[in-house]
Amino acid sequence: MALQWIVIVSLLISSAIGGGRDNMGTEFILGFMENKISGTANNIELFVTTTSNTPADITVTTPLFDPSFSETTTVSRGNIKKLELTYNIRGSGTAVENKGVRIVSTQEITVYGVNKERYSTDGFVAFPVDAIGLEYVLATWKSEAVFMIIGTEDGTTVQITLSSSNPTATSITYNGATYSNGQTLSVSLNKYQTFHAFSSSGDFTGTKLVSNKVITVMTGNRKVAVKDSMTRSSSDHLVEQVPPIDTLGKDFFTISTPDRNIGDYFRIIATEDSTEISLAGSVYTTINQYEYTELNVVTGDYKSITSNKPVMVTMFGKTISTQSGDGPNGGDPQFSILPAVPQFPSDYTFSTIQTPTGDFNNYLVVVIKDSAKNDLKLDEQSPSGVTWTPVSGSSHNLVVATFEVNPGSHSVYNTKPSATFLGMAFGNAQTNSYSYAAGTRLAPINGPCTPSSTVAGDIVDNDCDGWIDEEESNGIDDDGDGSIDEDLANLPRINGNWAAWGQWSACSLTCNSGTGSRSRSRTCTDPAPANNGIDCVGSGAETGSCTVNTPCPIDGQWGSWSAWNCSRTCGNGLNTRNRECDNPAPQHNGADCSGNSTESGACWAGTCYPSVLGNLDKNCTSSSFGCKAGNIDCVDLEKSCDGAVDCTDGSDEDPQVAGCTPACSGAGVNDGKHTLFVSLSAISVIFRNWRLLL
């Protein structure tokens, strides 16, 4: 099956409680078998997804392989992450190698492996370490058969017994010895070691594996054509991970590859002697342990397959034929191991992944009880426009329908968790096909059973009747076994829904200064997701713009300083200047200006001269005398030259300043005798200074 599209199928089932097993887990140890390379080799691909509402942190390593490989990634619900490993990690020939691949995760995940080469591709759903076992039986087609065993613990010993009844059984040459039909070889493995076996012309169907410690087992064909008289020669890689024998069952049915009319092969392999096989309610044949019977079933022939002892049922899609109308969209062989009816879950999700060369025509085949088909949801919608066909001979009143689905992710589940169903994914394109079970429970329904108390959705056969989680918590005997609510399915799936938005927060603005922001939140609580329900889609928070009408405070700012102003017109004084808080003035409760509104300092305004004699600056009035210095500025003019010192510096009696006549006794007492002289002297000084001004 060369890949153009590969469907990656994720099982969405209830969390395993109390030891339940399914194809979801937190640790996987896998291997990849030999493929036929044509041209440039392609890397191995791993796809991982989760049904947890908490993102899963995933690490992939090749612990023993050289060169070693390690990569980490995170995947959230509803998404798929792809990781690539070198094609050299594939097994080759018949040998023990160090090619185990380990995957660990912080949450339960579903893992898919894709072994892809040009025109030779297949994929498989991986089983976690807690769901694998000790005993297996193999199924392959008739040539280029391969199988691989991967050790999960040190000191593992596996006894491999080749089929003694397979008409096309093969031989194995290992460590210089050749083993053929009915013979047993022993292989020793440590953790992460692999044993790979290849036969170019034989068939390993019916080969038995028994191990002392749990092992992972892969089976299929390197590249093979699944032919009948009408088919062509196109071939493909086939691979499946093998379920342990203790998970096999007794209740199956046939289905058909969509978009084909050439029919399909089914092989039924017994795990115990005297196994009676019935088709559509009638005995068909009896086979012994590790024998198989093969059915060539025409397209559209849906019928039950039942047995009195556990069997493994495999489906081989045929190579495209020359028959008119067969494979209008192409097709190649494909290989699936069908789950037994008790292992069906009630909730799946699957997604298609495109390769560069084009699209598959993608299909989902559903088999469900007729009474439950109307409770089915595909992408949250009730299916319509499909034809439901009964399964002949089914005691469960099963019906089959095929849904064509677009590329992308899809979810299909039943609103009643006790109503389980089969989901098989198919795809056809030119020289390409794929098919495998969308998911499976892996409960040990074929092993010893001890009755236990039920926990809803625990994936455990609590009442040891070979069925799992078949009752609803309703006080009714749903399965008709005389007991009530003894093996409970999970409660109905509840998808999360957003509650109303909370109040908006305060605007980031406190005043009208532009556009601000605000936020609000909501919770996924109306209802909250429960019972494997999907979390709310979208964000629990949002922001929006906002404005405020309140004017913003305006803080005051100082205006310019005024000119300096001396407090005295002459002599020593106090120099001051001031400024106003008006550039701008504070508004709307804005802060006042900080600092002082005035500044001061000492100043000298110049010599205080007489206003009449020598005082051209007119610092004193015309009736005053300006002292030259000292603390007194001006005195009455009549006190100058009166023989009494009035200015502290004596300048009012100084002939050079006041113009007093030196000849006058008593320093020029102003007694009337000197008045005219003084006046004339003063006039003389005035005129002298006036001439200087001119």
Could you describe each region identified by the protein language model?
Residues 524, 581-582, 640, 645-646, ...:
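Short cysteine/histidine-rich zinc-coordinating motifs and their immediately flanking basic loops
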